[in-house]
Amino acid sequence: MAIARPGFSVYLTIAWPSPDTFLEIASTLKGCVDYLELGIPTPKPLYDGPTIRLTHLKAVESGYSGPKTLSLAEEASQEAGVPYIVMAYATEQPWSFSEVLREASRKGALSVLPPDLPFELPGHVEWYVEESRRLGMEPSLFASPKFPHRWLDRYRRLDPLLIYLGLQPATGVKLPLAFLRNVKTARKIVGQVYMLAGFSIKSPEDALRVLEAGADAVVVGSEVARLVSSGRLGEARHLACSIRAAISERGG
C-alpha cells in the first residue's frame, strides 16, 4: 500500500458545498493530485481552521455527516482517479469511531486519519493502529509542532502509512516562520516514515519550501475551499495543478 513520494494531496470536506459539486471538484482535480484527503463532516471540527470548519458545518446543516457519507468519498476517489484517505474525528461526533473504520475499509479507503486521537484519547493510539490493520487499512497519525519528541518516536515505531505534520494548531491560518525548523526536526526523529505536511500552504513556492525541509508530501485544503466557495473552481484546479507540477519537476 504505497502513496506517491514526493506527493501532493488536496483536502475536501465530503458533500460540501453539495454532493454534486463535491464530485465535480474531485473530477476537476483529476491529473492534479496523487491522492485525496476526504473529511467526514462533523458538528465540532475542533482541529480545523475557520475556513474548513465552515465547510463541515454547512455539510452537516444540509444533512450530511457520519460514516454514511463515505459512499460519496469512494465515488470522489473514482472521479479523481486516485486513492483516498479519510479524515475523521475520533471523539467529536455522535457515531462510533469503530463504525467509521469499518465503513472506510468497506469503501476502499487507504487509511483513516483521526486528528484528535493523540490529544483526546492518547491511550487508544495502539488500538487504532491494530484495528486499522485488522480491517485491511494502514494507520495515519497526526502530529503538531509542539509534540514531544518521544511521541514522534513512538509514531515512528508504529510504522504508519504516514505521519501528518500540522504546521499550525489549526488549519488555514498564516504560515509560521518556524515551519522549516518544525519539518526538519520531525524528519530527524521519524526517519524514513512518510511525512505529509499541511496547513497554510497556498502556492507552489510554499509547497517546495516544505518539501526541501524534509516532508515527503504536502496537502492543501483551506485555499482550495476559499476558491471553490467564491465560485472559482477553475482557479482551484490551476492551483492544484501548479503545485503538483512543481513537485513533479523537483522530483524525489
UniProtKB/Swiss-Prot annotation:
Q: Which GO terms fall under molecular function for this chain's record? A: tryptophan synthase activity
EC identifiers of the protein: 4.2.1.20
Q: Pathway of this protein?
A: Amino-acid biosynthesis; L-tryptophan biosynthesis; L-tryptophan from chorismate: step 5/5
Q: Where is the active site?
A: 37 (proton acceptor), 48 (proton acceptor)
Catalytic activity reported: (1S,2R)-1-C-(indol-3-yl)glycerol 3-phosphate + L-serine = D-glyceraldehyde 3-phosphate + L-tryptophan + H2O
Listed A to Z, the keywords are: Amino-acid biosynthesis, Aromatic amino acid biosynthesis, Lyase, Tryptophan biosynthesis
> Where does the source fall among the domains of life?
Archaea
Example GO CC term: the record gives: cytosol
User: Which InterPro entries would you find in this protein's record?
Assistant: Aldolase_TIM, RibuloseP-bd_barrel, Trp_synthase_alpha_AS, Trp_synthase_suA
> Pfam families this protein is in?
Trp_syntA
Function, in words: The alpha subunit is responsible for the aldol cleavage of indoleglycerol phosphate to indole and glyceraldehyde 3-phosphate.
How this chain assembles, per its entry, is: Tetramer of two alpha and two beta chains.
Q: Would you identify the family this protein belongs to, as annotated?
A: Belongs to the TrpA family.
**Protein's UniProt name:** Tryptophan synthase alpha chain
Q: Please report the organism this UniProt entry assigns to the protein.
A: Aeropyrum pernix (strain ATCC 700893 / DSM 11879 / JCM 9820 / NBRC 100138 / K1)
